[in-house]
Amino acid sequence: MSGLQLIWKSPTQLVLFVLLITISCIDLCHAVGAATPTKKSPPVRITKPQPVSSTTTAIPTTNEGSTTGEQLALLVSSTTEGTASSASSSSNGGSDDSSSTTAAGSLVPEICITGLQLSFTNADGEQVVRKQQELVQVIEGDVMLSVITSDPVSALFVINRVNQANLISADFEVGIRAINVDNASLAENLLIQEVQYLQQCTQYSMGIFIDFDLYKRLESIIRDLEYNVWPIPSARAHLFPKVAHLLHQMPWGEKIASVEIVTETLDIYNEFMDAARQEHMCLMHFKSDDNVYILFGNKMANHFKENGTVFAVPTERTEHIFLEELPNKSFILMENGIELRTADLDPMPTTLDEVLIGKSVLPSRILVFASPIVDLMNWLRGSLAKHCKRDEDLYMLESCFNFLNFIEDWRTPEYRRTHDTAELLSLLRMRKLSTSMLFQMYQKKQETVDVITGESRMELREIASQNFVTNVTTYYHYNRDNHTSLELKTKFGLVFNCQFTAGENRRYPFLFDGESVMFWRIKLDTWVATGLTAAILGLIATLAILVFIVVRISLGDVFEGNPVTSILLLLSLILVFCSFVPFSMEYVGEQRNSHVTFEDVHTLNTLCGVRVFIMTLVYCFVFSLLLCRAVMLASIGSEGGFLSHVNGYIQAIICVLSVFVQVGMSVQLLVVMHLASESVSCENIYYGRWLWGLLAYDFLLLCSLVSLVPFIYRSQRNYREGILIVIGAVLILIIWSVWIALSMFGDEWRDAAIPLGMQASGWAVLVGILIPRTFLIVRGIERSDIAQALPSLTSLAFAQNNQYSSEQSVYECVNPAMRHCSQEEMNHQSPSEIPTLPLRGGGPRRQQFFANLRQANANINPQRPPPHPQQSPSRSSVCSLPPSPDHSKITRF
């Protein structure tokens, strides 16, 4: 205690000590506060990369082998990396300027500093890194677009024209980042990086356009990105019609030859064949000594024969080395590259961006990219009018808010509008380019060797050209080179002309005289399996019912009504279910546009004719039989029916005449198709509107059957045949409405709807009429067995043990031979409408059995007179119907 008193002897020392403790506490609290992590606001978006100090992390390179999931995860995590690095750098903080500069620089996302990068292994096994300067060409603007394409110059030129024409009427310009893709396998990597760049490094970005083939390749990745990515329409839509037209118009003095089409993908092949179809041009492939090769793409195929003629169609920019590899006298069909010069663009003065000076563009690439861009700019201008203020004639960017919200609507293809070529050239101020937008045909001449230099020179002679805008075809050196007039040569398209192309639906236009390459097979569609299953099950059920009826008839059973009609209806259903076979078969080649011989055409027409003939006849058989039965029921019914009676002969005449009418029309159609096969095509009838004319008579029979529904639905005759026919007719009418509606959606739908509709109609008759009727027949046979097993009403034994005390007869409405009814009931019910039980037939064994039974009952007490039945006193009047005739004389309808 004395020591402490010595320490605080002086007040000055105490004050200094307290001050020292206070300063230490402040420093300690400051250090703790600095070390505690705090949540910082996310970095703001910037429009352009900002310069930072050199103390940055190493440049990350994106490997080609990295997975898509890792790159997509990078998009999620990249926005938080800047914040985390900023916090960690400030924890090591100090008061010097260099540390604060590093912290500020970390707010900029790294991709905004480094740009896009690719790291991949080349053909020599070396690791190659390509930076943004090699990949991306940029036109600066306030609102940015990106394009991933194999032809970036054409995309840059279109955006330059948009800014020069000021389509958006604003005080700012649209910028573009054009990314060159020379390898499709690298497109996925570039797309993911570009989405990340636009999200983090630009303030206003509309989306990304990508080549059509690349879009199809990356469609699943694009859906996962959930970003505005749109396909550029394929340039082949502009090129292939020009190729087909020039081939069709080309003079061709040779005989018909085999044509082999070499393409990189099946889609290219099908698109070109569709274009050739529009020109009525048949390109045939068969075994031949002379071959014509049409080569699509920029890769050379080396299997050409020496006597073959080669037509090369480059789908990208044509390289000189590709032309050198082609055989001499080959024909090259390609579009003309346009050198960009300001004076050649538009009468009004315009300028070009620096990146476009000295470059060339392709007409097809300009047109396919300009159409969606012009439509997008029109939507953007409409959005600016709603969300921006206008100063004189321009919309001010500073006053805009949410002006890019329209993109969600524009990305829907239904809202877009197409523009024709002349309109695009006028809007984008490049009207003078119309004379230079040509698709040309050249012929490679024999290479000559320069005597002085010793170098070989290749000469391309222009044969013809077609303008993209006017579609005018011009011929050049053909007359002089071939020493003959152009008009004296037969055109290529006339030599390879299509046959049997009458009508709007030309399904098989490519015909030739050669060996067939087509074969028979069952269709691979899902509906075929469904239809075959329904047809087999329906056939089994129909045969089972038919066998049952035939067996019961052979046993001597007597049915209500004539069973001949039921048997004919069952035979018609067998035809209905078997008719699915020609609809399930097809005669095809290996490809969609397989070449067809003239014999193949006759086979296809025969198959089509069989389908039409069977379809119309089986419907007619079923509807005619049902109609004649409905007419009979309506003619004898007491509840609103006709008063006359239609007997079996008239029914047969009605049915036969109804069938003969349809047979006559169907046979006439087959004769006409055979005699006029060049002008009448069964395919065009089957897939055209004439089909409804062929089915009009069947539909008339169905409508007549439905019109008799009010007159027959109460009929109880023939196992309640009236209500069963009503159910079947209504089901068939519903089925017809469904399959006719489905067949309107196209040829593929019609292929499935017609046979499935036939099977459904057969099942409607089976389920609605025949199966319930079979059940009633079985139940009636069992009741008949029970009734005939009882003792006879005339036997003495039965008479001795029974007294008639009931007011109503026990056997009333059981058999006409033993029916008692009141006079009042007779006035309200027609005898023809009273339901009866079928009588068992007179088979030998059954007749002997019941005869013995009656004889035994009669011999029990033969000397005792039969008692007289006592009538009930409460019954005022009782009447008996005359005895029923013998079962062998019963009249049925």
Swiss-Prot record:
Pfam families xref list: 7tm_3
Extracellular side: 32-530
Cytoplasmic side: 773-893
Membrane-topology annotation of the record: Multi-pass membrane protein
UniProt region (Disordered), positions on chain: 36-66, 82-102, 858-893
GO terms (BP aspect): visual perception
Name the UniProt record assigns to this protein: Protein bride of sevenless
Species annotation: Drosophila virilis
